[in-house]
Amino acid sequence: MDDVPFLKGHATRNDFVILPDHDDELELDAALVRAICDRRRGLGADGILRVVAVPADDAPVSSAGATADAAAGRPPQPSAGRPPQPAAARWFMDYRNADGSVAEICGNGIRLFARYLVDAGLEEAGRFLVGTRIGPVPVDVPPAGDVTAWLPAPELRGGGRARFDGRMLEGVRVSVGNPHLVCVVDTLADVDFTRAPVLDSDEFPDGANVEVVEIERPGVLRMRVYERGVGETWSCGSGACAVAAVAEGAERIPRPADGWWRIVVPGGELRIRFDGDRVALAGPAVVVAEGRLHLAALEKSDG
């Protein structure tokens, strides 16, 4: 394949390249991912969303960390105020970080992925499932406006630490299908994000996204994030869910009156609400461009 179609979009300025590959024909190796995501020699992005059709007789990919229903290929049981769940995912989100590594889930990425499916006429507006490496994830996509993903409820896994340029921060380890460390500080501006935080390899054998959080007012938190395999980004959806989970269980953090946590990131605002074994992640997601990508030119580019 010399030329492939692509789209570019973002969710609170967490930007992605979308590669429609319905028949699973594209060989997306780490070097190609790095070249595409490079902001000088490629398109530039925080990651890649490859769109693959799920065969009718195949179940979405699952893994440890998914809830029991997701691991079995079933949608979660509906709860009060939520519509009935669809039966199966028709599309699989193959997500890659900008460094070429494979990631379990991406909260902002799945919302953009879902927006693309509706805009492209591959799914109807409303609720449907997206297949991911942590199991099928329900999404709510209106014809226009914010997109909501219902991720598995985060799991708090005890304390952890990260060193930012000589400053040690204590935090809470969280799994949202992917690993996070949430650290609450008095002032975000005091934390140096110019270098990658150093993590304990015993606590995080596969690395982690590190979220640093400042309390703004009841129900509103400010967050910066250093994503594994990417660097500091303007937003991180699964990170916002991890932050809200820590806040939900912390007595010293004032809770929101309406149940929705507002997580303010450099790229905008995300809204988080807990409902049983799921957490709703809501916010904007928009496709801004499309075209064709010349793979041969990328492969011949320097470095």
Curated annotation (Swiss-Prot):
EC number: 5.1.1.7
GO biological process, one term: lysine biosynthetic process via diaminopimelate
Site, Could be important to modulate the pK values of the two catalytic cysteine residues: residue positions: 180, 227
UniProt-annotated location(s): Cytoplasm
Matching InterPro entries: DAP_epimerase_AS, DAP_epimerase_DapF
Enzyme category, top tier: isomerase
Pathway it works in: Amino-acid biosynthesis; L-lysine biosynthesis via DAP pathway; DL-2,6-diaminopimelate from LL-2,6-diaminopimelate: step 1/1
One CC-aspect GO term: cytosol
Catalytic activity of the protein: (2S,6S)-2,6-diaminopimelate = meso-2,6-diaminopimelate
PROSITE patterns listed in its UniProt record: DAP_EPIMERASE (PS01326)
Compositional bias annotation for Low complexity: 60-74
Active-site annotation: 106 (proton donor), 236 (proton acceptor)
Disordered, as annotated region: 60-86
Biased composition (Pro residues): 75-86
UniProt GO molecular function: diaminopimelate epimerase activity
Domain of life from the UniProt record: Bacteria
UniProt xrefs under Pfam families: DAP_epimerase
Principal subcellular localization: cytoplasm
Assigned keywords, A-Z: Amino-acid biosynthesis, Cytoplasm, Isomerase, Lysine biosynthesis
Residues noted as binding substrate in the record, renumbered to the chain: 14, 97, 107-108, 178, 209, 227-228, 237-238
Function noted in UniProt: Catalyzes the stereoinversion of LL-2,6-diaminopimelate (L,L-DAP) to meso-diaminopimelate (meso-DAP), a precursor of L-lysine and an essential component of the bacterial peptidoglycan.
Family: Belongs to the diaminopimelate epimerase family.
Assembly information from the UniProt record: Homodimer.
Protein name per the record: Diaminopimelate epimerase
